[in-house]
């Protein structure tokens, strides 16, 4: 029986010392990697650096902390590159202490990106730190079926996100965190996807890598009271549904 391929929906592959070795390890583990980027320039550089290879999609990103200081030229460049992107991310909002001063600029960029119809036809991975309610509201209004990456916001907003058709990606650091426990128990299994946010997220004492998602899946299997094989099949089916929703957006 074929083992379903899993997807690391949010990985900063360019931040590892040896990205190619990490990708090769992921391929052996049956993990497809979505390499998120922080701005259009980094997207073009990473595509050139890694080229076309099995098991990898480079996502077109505009991190909110970059977007807050962006020029109109940067936004125009992002929108110009959209047709060639298979995934979008990381985009979003950040109203934490690090980003609150650029709130208005971030909102302007995020709204401009979401207004482009092409965004509704791509899987999207979204940053929402300190701006969870605003991010969910913007995505719901735009009818974008996005993934909330490493969600740390109020549990009360989770139902709004689910009603908006959003997904949640879980990483190795989250399953080791007591703080994330209530979120994991609240999420319906059919809305859960996987991520590492590596190398920034940790897996024990080291940076997380895509192959660590096998352990994340084992934790979810115990939480859902099913076998690891059943959990892998369930998450793989979620990934297929995400792609279907992206390819067939609401009219």
Kindly label every feature range from the protein language model.
Residues 1-251:
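Mid-domain alpha/beta scaffold segments of enzyme catalytic cores
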